[in-house]
């Protein structure tokens, strides 16, 4: 079985979601199904069919999370000795050399990547260019619009 890297924060969030699904959502859906059953004929009972569909989706998500948690390798960046280099779990501030625009990214596993929250996958082009680099170094990222030059401004291990 292939192990997938994940930050401790990402694994904790998945564990929390799993507990919520099992302890809150699952009983609520079971109650909704029982309540819909009381309305009689199940063939034409839209509430019943909707609740069963919701149950199926929820159970699939529970299985997905359990499978994920069973195959992750949790990496706690605070326990690493990165020697000032960008590593998995680092939070990196970079400066676009052309536009002077600064952006901060946290390098995380595939399953926890979320660009809206500036969490990028370790397999993304930017993260691959950043890994093992130090503050002050410049990197080149190949983008559809051409190469983009960045300078590493700051590396944090939180």
From Swiss-Prot:
GO molecular function: DNA binding; RNA polymerase binding
Primary role: Necessary for efficient RNA polymerase transcription elongation past template-encoded arresting sites. The arresting sites in DNA have the property of trapping a certain fraction of elongating RNA polymerases that pass through, resulting in locked ternary complexes. Cleavage of the nascent transcript by cleavage factors such as GreA or GreB allows the resumption of elongation from the new 3'terminus. GreA releases sequences of 2 to 3 nucleotides.
Keywords: DNA-binding, Transcription, Transcription regulation
InterPro entries to which the protein is assigned, alphabetical: GreA/GreB_C_sf, TF_GreA/GreB_CS, Tscrpt_elong_fac_GreA, Tscrpt_elong_fac_GreA/B, Tscrpt_elong_fac_GreA/B_C, Tscrpt_elong_fac_GreA/B_fam, Tscrpt_elong_fac_GreA/B_N, Tscrpt_elong_fac_GreA/B_N_sf
Similarity-based family: Belongs to the GreA/GreB family.
PANTHER family per the UniProt record, alphabetical: TRANSCRIPTION ELONGATION FACTOR GREA
Protein name, per record: Transcription elongation factor GreA
GO terms, biological process: DNA-templated transcription elongation; regulation of DNA-templated transcription elongation
Entry annotated with the keyword Ligase: no
Protein's UniProt keywords contain Transcription: yes
Pfam families attached to this UniProt entry: GreA_GreB, GreA_GreB_N
Domain of life from the UniProt record: Bacteria
């Amino acid at each position: 079985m292939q192990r997938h890297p994940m930050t401790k924060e990402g694994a904790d969030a998945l564990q929390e979601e799993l507990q919520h699904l099992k302890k809150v959502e699952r009983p609520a859906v079971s109650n909704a199904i029982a309540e819909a059953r009381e309305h009689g004929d199940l063939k034409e009972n839209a509430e019943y069919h909707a609740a069963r569909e919701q149950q199926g989706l929820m159970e699939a998500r529970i299985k997905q999370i359990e499978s994920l948690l069973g195959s992750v390798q949790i990496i706690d960046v605070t326990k690493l000795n990165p020697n000032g280099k960008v590593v998995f779990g680092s939070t990196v501030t970079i400066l676009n050399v052309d536009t002077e625009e600064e952006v901060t990214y946290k390098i995380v596993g595939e399953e926890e990547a979320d660009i809206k929250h500036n969490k990028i996958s370790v397999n993304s082009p930017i993260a691959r260019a950043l890994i093992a680099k130090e503050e002050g170094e410049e990197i080149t990222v190949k983008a559809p619009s051409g190469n983009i030059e960045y300078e590493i401004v700051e590396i944090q291990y939180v």
